[in-house]
């Protein structure tokens, strides 16, 4: 319950106005950054998954998205996944569980870096580390 209270508080006090726009040939898609839970990759196509379980597919390299979002609390956890850290519930050996119980793979080579960055992120955002 405490985690959910923090989570709701953080979301309501986060920078609500900050958005990211994806501009493609024939369309523009806009998201509030704090509504994106994670991004999964299938080669050149990326699925952007929101907290409402809406999925939009864009054709932008995952590395480009990683660079654009890394200063907004997103972290690359696998060659095919970028996760918004506000939605991380737990980090286990080879997976990350999100607040909606979705499990994202965590690559072994990125594990230590992800843990270190998540702890720093959590401390900077008033999480209690036990």
Segments from the language model and where they lie:
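Intrinsically disordered, low-complexity protein-interaction/activation regions
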Residues: 125-130
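Conserved binding/recognition cores within well-folded domains
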Residues: 2-99, 103-106
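Short, surface-exposed, low-complexity cationic segments
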Residues: 115-117
